[in-house]
Each structure stands twice: as C-alpha cells, then as structure tokens.
Amino acid sequence: MPSLLVVVFVIELVVQLVNTIGATTINNLIWRAYLSIPTSLAKQFTEQRQKQKEYLAVRLELNATSSQDEFAKWAKLRRQHDKLLDELEKKKSAVEASRTKFDRYITAVRFISTRGVQWLLPMWYGKLPMFWLPYGWFPYYVEWFVSFPRAPLGSVSIVTWQAACTAILTLVMNAVVGILAFISASRQSGKQKQKQPVPAAGARNGETKKEL
C-alpha cells in the first residue's frame, strides 16, 4: 500500500495539473480518445462527419448551379440539400446531447477522484501524524500549528501536509508556465526578425552615392 504522504502529494499534483491545463481541455482530450474506441457513440460521430461532408458537397454544387438556367437540376439539388440539412441537424443534436452527458460524467468522476478525496482524507486521517518533527527543535506554537487540527502535538497533520504540497506545486507550476511562455515568446520574436526584409547592398550603395 502506498504511503499516505505519497497519496496526498499525488492528489495535489493531479489537482494542480487540472487547474493548469484546464478542465475543458482535459474533457476534449478524453472525448477524442473515447471517440477513437469502436463504440456506438464513435459510430454516431463518424456518421455525422460523413453526413456533413455530403451536405457541404451538395451545398457547393447548389451554389454553383443557376436557378434560372438549370432550374430542374437546381430544384433537385435544393431538395437534396434540405433533406441532408435536416438529417445533419438531427445527428448533430444527438451527438451534442451525448457530449453533454459525457462531460457531466467526466466532471463528476474528476471531482470525486480529486476534490472529493482531497476533502475526505483529512476527515478520515485527521488524527494520524504524517511524520514527526525533531524533538525540541521548534517552539510550542510551531508544533501546535503544524499539528492542527487533530494530529498529535509535535507531528505534521495531513491538513498541513496538503497545504505544503499545494504551495510548493503552485510555485513549481507557475515557474514552469512562465519558462514555457518565455521560450515561446523568444521563438516568436526570432521568427519575426527573420521575416523582416534586409536592404540589398546595391540599394545601400545607391543611397550613399545620392548623398555624395
């Protein structure tokens, strides 16, 4: 069984990753991964994409057909266009309803497995010391503070350990995001400098002669 210290740290790490990446982005990634599995929902999504391609092809042909010069062809394409549009709207509504249910399920699972466990562990292991402080190294008020609310005096409580993990991980995440943003900005500025036109040597010489 993994140590409670490690369990708490991993949970806090997952929470920080979710906050940094974003719940919507995670839902989108899981949704795409789920659609790659051969399920009825994946089949439904594939049918919708295929129907959308058919609709766009008919719409393109309809726009290219004159209603005055080729009325019969235009009327046939119009009926086909309206039929495909109706079928596409139905399939799109069905997929969107499935996506809404999927997002609710993923959100509930993520909340229970992160925030729910995050709240449950201090209630269940509130009296259990995470580790003990060296005896006599810290004054009484420090020992009382780190053992708050129910851990034995002189030990570090699970609440304090959670707060310490959250603070450290937040600093690390902010530092990583800042470094990545700096690298990205440096690359973009480098590309912009490369795109700037450099004056030709002949043009410079011509300007010099004119000045003379």
UniProtKB/Swiss-Prot annotation:
UniProt feature coiled coil, ranges: 72-100
GO terms for cellular component: endoplasmic reticulum membrane; GET complex
Highest taxon, organism lineage: Eukaryota
Keyword field contains Membrane: yes
Membrane topology reported for the UniProt record: Multi-pass membrane protein
Lumenal side: 1-4, 132-155
Family: Belongs to the WRB/GET1 family.
Protein name: Protein GET1
